């Protein structure tokens, strides 16, 4: 299936890296952030892929570190009036969709996601309109507008079960936006699926050849892979799953050395769970200066201490997430379909990334 618009051929301009802070500057920002969180009745909610110092601060101040859906759920259930979402834009939108009555702020609204950027709502809607007999299933790593166009919103932890269910009902499926995850699901379910050709700039860079070479160096190591990675990389995995599932696998596998093919931001929480195990970054297609993301999302890196402080001090249009109410209500329908399906199966739904 070819697309007139092929996001897999797009080269995304990466944001500039934040200016490094001195240790004294870090301490000053941390103390100010702690005071502002109390003053503003706010809580820090951080994704696994943010920098370790951000995750540590979230935990230290009574906030939360988790995957995208867990973040939105935590914000929904916490008593704070203001949520500081440290992640990428769709995560802030997800929090607002589930908790419209709260102020949802982000360190920067320019923290994008290549899966979201690669799936513009207008182009995706045209694709769906061209196949009106297909059920539209989208990954949670999408904008509110794309979610609103879908029949189902899924996370990687339950995508297989939902697609199997739809396939058993004889449904043909449009899947978006991640082509690698879509191909993984298609292979494991045998479902008829039209795949949107988006990709995560981090996971797309992992190299099967380099991973095989690394495995030869560490034959006793287990390989943990996120399913947004290319099929050739997934084929080498001892465990495949979302961020939360990979952390769980790290605990359960007997291996003392783990090669991890996902954003290296996950090492902070994973190492907490397995302090006696050695974690090794899986190799990317490039090495050193020749890789682009180098196993760390450039937009996640924008969630720095200075930016968090600015969000708490300034708020407003530079930091606050707004979702059109009609769009919010419409996007809740496919999201609730997933949650209700999970409840019937008594599955605990985890997020994606």
From Swiss-Prot:
Keywords: 4Fe-4S, Cytoplasm, Iron, Iron-sulfur, Metal-binding, Pyridine nucleotide biosynthesis, Transferase. Pathway: Cofactor biosynthesis; NAD(+) biosynthesis; quinolinate from iminoaspartate: step 1/1. SUPFAM superfamilies: NadA-like. Its main location: cytoplasm. Its EC number is 2.5.1.72. It catalyses: iminosuccinate + dihydroxyacetone phosphate = quinolinate + phosphate + 2 H2O + H(+). Iminosuccinate binds at residues 47, 68, 139-141, 156, 226-228, 243. Gene3D superfamilies: NadA-like. The keyword Aminoacyl-tRNA synthetase does not apply. Binds 1 [4Fe-4S] cluster per subunit. One of its GO terms (molecular function) is 4 iron, 4 sulfur cluster binding. It is found in: Cytoplasm. It is an enzyme of class 2 (transferase). GO terms for cellular component: cytosol. It comes from the Bacteria. Its cofactor is [4Fe-4S] cluster. GO terms for biological process: 'de novo' NAD biosynthetic process from L-aspartate. [4Fe-4S] cluster binds at residues 113, 200, 297. Belongs to the quinolinate synthase family. Type 1 subfamily. Catalyzes the condensation of iminoaspartate with dihydroxyacetone phosphate to form quinolinate. NCBIfam families: nadA, PRK09375.1-1, PRK09375.1-2. This is Quinolinate synthase. The lineage of its organism: Bacteria, Pseudomonadati, Pseudomonadota, Gammaproteobacteria, Vibrionales. The gene is nadA.
């Amino acid at each position: 299936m070819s697309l007139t618009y092929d996001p897999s051929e797009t080269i995304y301009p990466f944001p500039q890296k934040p200016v490094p802070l001195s240790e004294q500057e870090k301490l000053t920002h941390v103390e100010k952030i702690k005071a502002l969180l109390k003053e503003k009745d706010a809580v820090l909610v951080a994704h696994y892929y943010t920098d370790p110092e951000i995750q540590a601060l979230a935990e230290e101040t009574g906030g939360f570190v988790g995957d995208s859906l867990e973040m939105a759920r935590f914000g929904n259930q916490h008593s704070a009036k203001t949520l500081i979402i440290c992640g990428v834009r769709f995560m802030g939108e997800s929090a607002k969709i589930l908790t419209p009555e709260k102020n949802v702020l982000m360190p920067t609204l320019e923290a994008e996601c290549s899966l979201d950027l690669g799936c513009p709502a207008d182009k995706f809607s045209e694709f769906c309109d061209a196949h009106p007999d297909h059920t539209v299933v989208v990954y949670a790593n999408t904008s509110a507008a794309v979610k609103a166009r879908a029949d189902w919103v899924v996370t990687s932890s339950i995508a297989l079960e939902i697609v199997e269910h739809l396939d058993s009902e004889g449904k043909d499926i449009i899947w978006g936006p991640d082509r690698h995850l879509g191909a993984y699901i298609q292979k494991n379910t045998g479902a008829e699926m039209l795949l949107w050709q988006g990709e995560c700039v981090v996971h797309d860079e992992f190299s099967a050849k380099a991973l095989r070479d690394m495995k030869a160096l560490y034959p006793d190591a287990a390989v943990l892979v996120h399913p947004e990675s290319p099929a050739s990389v997934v084929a080498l995995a001892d465990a495949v799953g979302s961020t939360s599932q990979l952390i769980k696998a790290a605990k359960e596998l007997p291996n003392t050395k783990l090669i991890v093919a996902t954003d290296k931001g996950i090492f902070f929480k994973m190492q907490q769970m397995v302090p006696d195990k050695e974690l090794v970054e899986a190799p990317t297609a490039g090495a050193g200066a020749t890789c682009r993301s180098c196993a760390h999302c450039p937009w996640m890196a924008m969630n720095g201490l200075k930016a968090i402080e600015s969000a708490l001090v300034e708020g407003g249009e530079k930091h606050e997430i707004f979702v059109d109410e009609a769009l919010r209500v419409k996007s809740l329908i496919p999201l609730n379909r997933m949650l209700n399906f999970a409840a019937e199966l008594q599955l605990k739904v985890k997020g994606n990334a």
